[in-house]
Amino acid sequence: MENIEKKCQPETINEDNNDEKQYEPEIIEFTVNGFNYVVKFSKTCVPSIHITCTHVEEFYSWSFTTDKNIDNQIPTNTIENVAKQDIKIHPKMLFDMFCSFKNNSLEKMFELVFPKDFKTHETNLNIYIFTTIAYSKYVDHKYISLAQVEISEYDRFLLKSSKANKLFMEQTKKELNDMREINETLKNEINNTKNIFNESIKNLVENFECEYAKDKTIESIKTEEENFEDFEKLMKKFLANPKCMKYIIDAISNSNVFATKDEL
């Protein structure tokens, strides 16, 4: 690959802010088959695309950069490929394909096949691009070869430790949130039970007061004859008890005062 910066040297830098913004790179990120991909498209005078692929567990990395069309052909010997026309995929087109893939909107004529694993961290990884021509048996085959990015074991250890710590913090945060939700639920249930209990006591008191008032009202409207009948019933019940009769006899025996017939 030619030096992109060298190609851009003759270009003058536009100091207008709006012009500067149009040269800001576009970056997308997605994960496929246990590999995290960061794709950057640079809108410089010579547009280029840079792809970084990192294994999410082992943190080995591979990368690919180009400002040219993707023309890596996979050799085939089929008759349909004898008169084939090479399909040009320039950096911007490739970036748009990755964007569509991420958004699940890639055209049916294109297929991107990503690595599922790696043999060793020194082995290149390939992303395959299959393009099917409508009404034709011809399928265009291309691939992008990502080369190893050097990384020390110490840096890998730091990345693994950082990820483990992040996962631990996320799990701890989740458990704390779950506990808060459980506590809030218990608090609400206790408050609801307390409210139901208070309401039940309130209704019980109101019913008691209502019944008591009703009894007082009934008692107040009774006639003198009805009241005497009630008294008579109580006395008969009282006198029917032998113990009560004994108390009366003892009281009369120990008393010097007797009621006369007229007093009765």
UniProtKB/Swiss-Prot annotation:
Say which domain of life the source belongs to: Viruses
Positions of region (Disordered): 1-20
Regarding protein family, the annotation reads: Belongs to the mimivirus R73/L269/L862 family.
Name the UniProt record assigns to this protein: Uncharacterized protein L269
The taxonomy runs:
Viruses, Varidnaviria, Bamfordvirae, Nucleocytoviricota, Megaviricetes
